[in-house]
């Protein structure tokens, strides 16, 4: 959406949903089957919602070119796992409701990440470049007192092929650019709840 002249606002929302069910049966006649047969059912579900809000400004003043952006992003992810098993079936109708004994296990994990970011790029005559970026990320995978982290970078580049002293070799060297950058980045734990003390319990019915 064009707010004013070279100033634009964009909003993107993406939602992904996936679910899969896997049934495994060892009947009474298979090598791994119990006398009454065994049936397992595994159901996996993944939900992910991403939002991205960006305010961008792109403009040129003679040989000066500016590209700036401010953004806000969120990512919400939920994973659910359900496992059910039945055995000691009286006949060949292998449904969990017909099992002589059953067991079940369930697991659910959720994760959220929120980000504020900004960047600015400047170049003069498409020859000399300067770039700055900064972002702050908050992740639910980290303890509350360490949940937020800030990361930044600065870069510069020189397209030397456009310099006049290289005119004699431009028929051989078609492009050339030097770029340097420095910054700070980070990664988050792969475990959703590594910072917490977790307890596991189970109930078995016969």
Where are these regions (language model features)?
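Extracellular/periplasmic, surface-exposed regions of secreted and cell-surface proteins
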Residues: 1-26, 35-206
């Amino acid at each position: 959406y064009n707010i004013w002249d070279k100033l634009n606002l964009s909003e993107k929302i993406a939602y992904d949903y996936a679910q899969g069910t896997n049934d495994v049966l060892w009947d009474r006649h298979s090598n791994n089957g119990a006398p009454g047969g065994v049936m397992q059912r595994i159901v996996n579900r993944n939900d992910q919602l991403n939002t991205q809000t960006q305010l961008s400004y792109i403009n040129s003043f003679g040989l000066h070119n500016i590209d700036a952006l401010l953004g806000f992003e969120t990512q919400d992810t939920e994973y659910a796992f359900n496992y059910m098993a039945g055995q000691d079936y009286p006949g060949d109708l292998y449904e969990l409701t017909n099992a002589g004994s059953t067991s079940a296990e369930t697991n659910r994990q959720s994760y959220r990440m929120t980000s504020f970011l900004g960047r600015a790029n400047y170049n003069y005559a498409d020859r000399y470049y300067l770039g700055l970026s900064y972002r702050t990320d908050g992740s639910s995978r980290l303890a509350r007192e360490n949940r937020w982290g800030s990361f930044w970078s600065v870069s510069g580049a020189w397209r030397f092929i456009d310099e006049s002293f290289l005119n004699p070799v431009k028929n051989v060297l078609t492009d050339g650019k030097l770029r340097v950058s420095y910054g700070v980045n980070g990664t988050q734990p792969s475990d959703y709840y590594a910072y917490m003390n977790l307890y596991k319990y189970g109930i078995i019915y016969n």
